[in-house]
Design a protein with these regions (language model features):
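Ligand-binding clefts/hinges and TM-proximal coupling segments of bilobed small-molecule sensing domains
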Residues: 4, 9, 145-162, 199-201, ...
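Extracytoplasmic small-molecule ligand-binding "clamshell" domains
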Residues: 5, 9-90, 99
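Short, well-ordered beta-strand segments
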Residues: 11-13, 137-140, 180, 220
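Bilobed "Venus flytrap"/periplasmic-binding protein-like clamshell domains
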Residues: 16-19, 43-60, 91, 110-169, ...
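Acidic, polar ligand-binding/catalytic clefts
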Residues: 55, 59, 64-130, 204-212
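A ligand-binding cleft/hinge motif common to bilobed small-molecule-binding domains
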Residues: 73-77, 90-100, 147-152, 173, ...
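Periplasmic-binding protein-like
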Residues: 108-119, 193-236, 255-262
Length: 262
């Protein structure tokens, strides 16, 4: 959406490595016949919840979807540089991010959880207090709103955070971390192909506080590009993408479509 391209291309940035929100695959086909989207400048394709939503919105706006793959650590920098025009990447709308970007209303609502090793020392945890003073090694993804939550696990050892969620889950599998704080869909996606993982949704009366921001997953544009933000929001409204039942149905669908490698 740059200059004369405004009505032609919907240029979207995403990690393409954050299943089930977005991932990279070899072909444009999925098991249910949905079409993955070619990654700009690549021989690979992207699919997942973010891609499916982006395609719906591009269709509504009469635009061609163009997916740009970018490292999570530089996803905002590349938006500001003009490499693409919006971020649809499982991004939570936080107060800190709102200072830098314009956001739509949520296109997904997610719950947070912890992931531990199945059958391990922490597999019977029910609430946050069960982890207190155990000296558990905690981790999450870099550059996310989950990092501040780690400090709420009393006496935990900060074992280091990772660029991708895949690395977080590998740390749980190999024992270099005991607890990963993450969202439920991402954990469910990983558990489909990693039998070492156990997902625990903490008791609502014994869980993290101040994590509400990470529940709202929104589309970001550059701070001054409110016209594009509003155009995307209008498209969301037009297709009724404020219905949590629709969101959950699509998420359930894409969870079954990811290649085993993701």
């Amino acid at each position: 959406l740059v200059g004369s391209e405004m009505c032609i291309r919907d240029r979207v940035g995403m990690e393409c490595a954050y299943a089930p929100f977005n991932w990279t695959q070899d072909t444009d086909t999925t098991p249910d016949g949905s079409k993955a989207v070619k990654i700009a400048g690549s021989d690979y394709y992207a699919y997942g919840y973010d891609v499916a939503v982006a395609q719906k919105l591009a269709d509504q706006m009469g635009m061609d979807l163009e997916v740009h793959k970018v490292e999570w650590s530089s996803i905002g920098i590349s938006l500001d540089a003009g490499d693409y025009d919006c971020i649809i990447a499982g991004m939570g709308k936080t107060k800190e991010r709102e200072a830098s970007y314009a956001f739509t209303e949520p296109y997904y609502y997610r719950n947070n959880c912890i992931v531990v090793k199945k059958g391990g020392k922490y597999s019977n945890v029910k609430g946050l207090s069960d982890l207190a003073d155990t000296g558990c090694k905690v981790t999450t993804q870099l550059g996310t709103g989950w990092i501040p939550l780690l400090d709420q696990i009393k006496g935990a050892e900060q074992s280091g955070n990772f660029e991708t969620t895949s690395e977080c889950f590998l740390a749980i599998s190999n024992g270099s971390a005991d607890v990963c704080v993450i969202d439920v869909p991402t954990a469910e996606s990983a558990a489909l192909t990693n039998d070492d993982l156990q997902i625990i949704e903490l008791d609502e009366n014994d869980t993290f506080t101040g994590d509400d921001e990470m529940v709202n997953v929104c589309i970001a544009t550059r701070k001054d590009d409110t016209a594009l933000r509003d155009k995307i929001q209008d498209a969301m409204n037009a297709i009724g993408w404020n219905d949590k039942a629709k969101m959950d149905e699509l998420m359930d669908q894409v969870l079954t479509q990811q290649p085993a490698a993701n």
